[in-house]
């Protein structure tokens, strides 16, 4: 584009103001945030010409939520960002496990739904996940503003 502004598609995808096209980012911080989310949620090996692009976060879904797994997740994120988003500096990665205290679909009476609700006998009803908070600085910003992204795995 001739005006010197770089444009990128905002992730997660949404419609533009006119509703005809995908929304584009015109601000650097918005574009970097979209690029970071896109990088984190892309599985390694899913891009034909860039097989190393992305992360292996999906592989950690059923791993134990302990320090060793958290260190592996941090390393995975840091290595991918260093390689594919060089204008971003990660300040801190915080990972914390939590248990969803809301009732799961299997605990609710099936009369409330039009579809049958199934429950696996003997299965644990608590769903364990981890919350990953990534604090980063945009190196292209003259003021060095800090931003963060939170994803759940």
What do these predicted ranges mean?
Residues 1-75, 79, 91-92, 96-153:
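Immediate N-terminus of the mature polypeptide
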